[in-house]
């Protein structure tokens, strides 16, 4: 019956746009022509006018789609997303067009399958579902449901924070500070280069690398979208980077978009923290419930009810934050804004730096490999500098663990040069501890901040949860966002940095020697050896203040000087011969109460007279004398410098 009616009407309802019934000359079809013999028309008179009107509308629709098909044939799609207008406007119009086309196709299929009795209803449905045709395409107010960011909101928020930091670093105020202050700072000039163009080229390369990381994350998000127009965005970014055309108000729009996104990021950070609280409450609730189920007591406490109330309230908080944060935002909505930000950053970096980083470095790739960042040594050298600065602050009380840690962390080149440099190091005049610290401060005052920036840069916002756990107000400038790579040890020359570190270690050795000497109340043996005489150690002037020697010590010294040694007898046997007498007065024994609570020291001075008997000078360091007698003053093998007496810290 349906096929019979379609033939009698002269309309092909199976056509895609239902326009085959319209005459080629534009005339209206004659629905009232005479029927063949034996057949009667089933068309109601009032129905004929409605069908003529609907066919006219379908004819107009056919003309529109035929125009779009001819346009599509001229522009062959090569897989690269094309945005002839602003990306957000073009994407919305394309999305609306796809929705309208799908509606027309679906309605046409329904119309071809429908019977004559439902023809009017189907045509009415087709007319009511069609949207107005505008210059931007078919606009539809239907939002895509079920395509929210969800758990990806935290990763997207981390990406938005990166874009905010990059835009902030490209502001006019920060660029003026970069060119007027940072590039002329002592740390950059001494460790990196004093060529302004070379420094500017390094900064431009760093900014483009940050943009590449940000755009790479945007491309990754686009490939996960259900809408195919967001796929392969890298091709689109490559094309617009080669055809950079300035656009009006692009900067103002991008800054406004970033500010709006940062508000959502703030709510997302709060959501991250509240989800952790919710997880702990759920875990506590389940544990409490199991305990009460396994409990022998029939009466249950109020603890489970309280936890249940807190859990219910926390779920409401999480639900509210999900609506305010990026969690409930649509994928396409956020992608539009991220694409606009990438477009703005491409133009902004080009306007500020031009093609500075495109020019090859004069020193070539070999010089680039000698820098600490590409070699992966920036953070290690920064830790060494921080250790030196810490030891300078407490030079008089350096522990053996701190000394060993610093020595073991030194690079091989510095270890090889340390021995010869310490032996050849001479001071024109005797310097006090304050003067030595002032001399070291001339280098440390610019070297330590560079090391600190390196540490901060390595512990910056990298992981998804770090920015959320800090609890920072992301609507303001993030902490550490103003640190540029040029301010760290990343671009520092390895050779220059090792020279400055070696100089600080030599001065540190001299400082520790002087600090220990002053702490004992007088000078001591100089640890700085002359290159002409490295074997003999000379005693310097007498100490300013002489410690009091007890009566027992004086008696022991007198007896030791009068005693005659037996030939061919070792020292230990010689002492054993006077065992009974030594037991009566034994202040030199480690088990004696005299020894307890006395601080140990590694310095010693022993005078010998022509008689061959050692005279122990307790005025210099009586603790070292005990170590020599007990033979516990032998240093570890790897400390060759300590064994020679050249290194005292």
Swiss-Prot record:
Induction: By sucrose.
Keyword Lipoprotein listed: yes
Entry's localization field: Nucleus
Listed InterPro entries: DUF3475 (IPR021864), DUF668 (IPR007700), PSI1/2/3 (IPR045021)
Pfam families with a match to the protein in the record: DUF3475, DUF668
Lipid-conjugated positions (N-myristoyl glycine): 2
Disruption phenotype: Reduced response to phytosulfokine (PSK) in roots. Small rosettes and dwarf plants as well as early senescence of older leaves. Reduced fertility, premature senescence and severe dwarfism in psi2-1 psi3-1 plants due to reduced cell growth and proliferation as well as premature leaf growth arrest. Plants missing both PSI1 and PSI3 are dwarf and contain reduced starch levels; these phenotypes are partially rescued by sucrose.
Gene Ontology biological process terms from the UniProt entry: positive regulation of growth; regulation of carbohydrate metabolic process; response to peptide hormone; response to sucrose
Coiled-coil stretches: none
Presence of keyword Lipoprotein: yes
Alphabetical keyword list: Developmental protein, Lipoprotein, Myristate, Nucleus
Region (Disordered): 18-43
One GO CC term on file: mitochondrion
Disulphide bridges: none
Domain of life: Eukaryota
Role this protein plays: Promotes plant growth, especially at the vegetative stage, probably via the regulation of phytosulfokine (PSK) signaling; PSK are peptide phytohormones acting as growth factors. Together with PSI2 and PSI3, required during vegetative growth and reproduction. May also have a function in carbohydrate metabolism.
PANTHER family the UniProt entry points to: OS01G0873900 PROTEIN (PTHR31730), PROTEIN PSK SIMULATOR 3 (PTHR31730:SF2)
Protein name per the record: Protein PSK SIMULATOR 3
Organism: Arabidopsis thaliana (Mouse-ear cress)
């Amino acid at each position: 019956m349906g096929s019979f009616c379609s033939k009698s009407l002269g309309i092909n309802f199976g056509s895609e746009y239902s326009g085959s019934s319209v005459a080629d000359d534009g005339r209206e079809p004659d629905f009232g022509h005479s029927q063949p013999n034996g057949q009667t028309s089933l068309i109601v008179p009032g129905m004929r006018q409605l069908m003529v009107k609907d066919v006219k509308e379908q004819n107009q629709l056919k003309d529109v789609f035929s125009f779009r098909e001819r346009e599509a044939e001229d522009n062959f799609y090569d897989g690269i997303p094309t945005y002839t207008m602003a990306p957000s406007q073009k994407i919305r119009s394309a999305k609306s067009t796809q929705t309208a086309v799908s509606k027309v196709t679906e309605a046409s299929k329904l119309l071809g399958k429908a019977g004559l009795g439902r023809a009017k209803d189907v045509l009415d449905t087709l007319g009511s579902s069609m949207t107005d045709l505008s210059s931007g395409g078919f606009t539809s107010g239907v939002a895509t449901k079920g395509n929210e960011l969800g758990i990806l909101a935290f990763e997207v928020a981390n990406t938005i924070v990166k874009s905010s930091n990059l835009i902030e670093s490209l502001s006019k105020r920060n660029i003026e500070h970069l060119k007027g202050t940072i590039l002329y700072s002592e740390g950059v000039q001494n460790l990196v280069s004093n060529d302004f163009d070379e420094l500017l080229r390094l900064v431009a390369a760093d900014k483009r690398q940050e943009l590449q990381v940000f755009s790479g994350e945007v491309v990754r998000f686009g490939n996960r979208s259900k809408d195919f127009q967001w796929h392969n965005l890298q091709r689109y970014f490559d094309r617009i980077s080669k055809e950079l055309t300035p656009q009006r108000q692009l900067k103002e729009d991008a800054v406004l978009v970033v500010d709006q996104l940062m508000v959502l990021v703030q709510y997302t950070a709060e959501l991250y923290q509240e989800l952790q609280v919710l997880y702990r409450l759920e875990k506590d609730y389940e544990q409490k419930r199991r305990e009460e189920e396994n409990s022998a007591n029939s009466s249950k406490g109020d603890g489970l009810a309280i936890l249940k109330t807190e859990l219910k309230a926390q779920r409401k908080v999480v639900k509210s934050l999900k609506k305010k944060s990026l969690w409930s935002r649509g994928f396409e909505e956020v992608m539009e804004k991220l694409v606009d930000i990438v477009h703005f950053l491409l133009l902004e970096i080009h306007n500020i730096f031009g093609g500075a980083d495109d020019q090859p470095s004069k020193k070539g790739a070999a010089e680039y490999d000698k820098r600490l960042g590409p070699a992966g040594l920036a953070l290690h050298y920064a830790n060494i500098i921080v250790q030196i600065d810490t030891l300078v602050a407490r030079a008089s009380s350096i522990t053996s663990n701190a000394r060993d840690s610093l020595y073991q962390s030194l690079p091989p080149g510095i270890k090889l040069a340390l021995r010869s440099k310490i032996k050849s190091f001479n001071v024109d005049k005797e310097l006090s501890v304050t003067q030595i610290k002032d001399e070291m401060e001339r280098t440390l005052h610019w070297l330590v901040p560079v090391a600190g920036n390196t540490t901060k840069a390595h512990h910056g916002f990298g992981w998804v949860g770090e920015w959320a756990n800090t609890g920072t107000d992301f609507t303001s400038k993030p902490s550490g966002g103003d640190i540029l790579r040029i301010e760290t040890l990343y671009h520092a020359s390895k050779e220059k940095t090792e020279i400055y570190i070696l100089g600080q270690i030599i001065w540190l050795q001299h400082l520790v020697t002087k600090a220990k000497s002053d702490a004992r109340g007088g000078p001591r043996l100089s640890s700085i050896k002359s290159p002409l005489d490295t074997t003999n150690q000379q005693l310097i002037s007498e100490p300013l203040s002489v410690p009091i020697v007890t009566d027992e010590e004086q008696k022991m010294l007198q007896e030791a000087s009068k005693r005659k040694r037996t030939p061919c007898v070792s020292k230990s046997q010689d002492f054993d011969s006077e065992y009974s007498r030594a037991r009566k007065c034994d202040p030199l024994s480690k088990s004696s109460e005299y020894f307890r609570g006395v601080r140990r020291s590694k310095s010693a001075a022993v005078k010998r007279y022509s008689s061959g008997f050692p005279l122990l000078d307790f005025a210099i360091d009586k603790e070292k004398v005990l170590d020599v007698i007990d033979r516990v003053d032998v240093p570890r093998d790897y400390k060759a410098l300590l064994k020679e007496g050249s290194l005292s810290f």
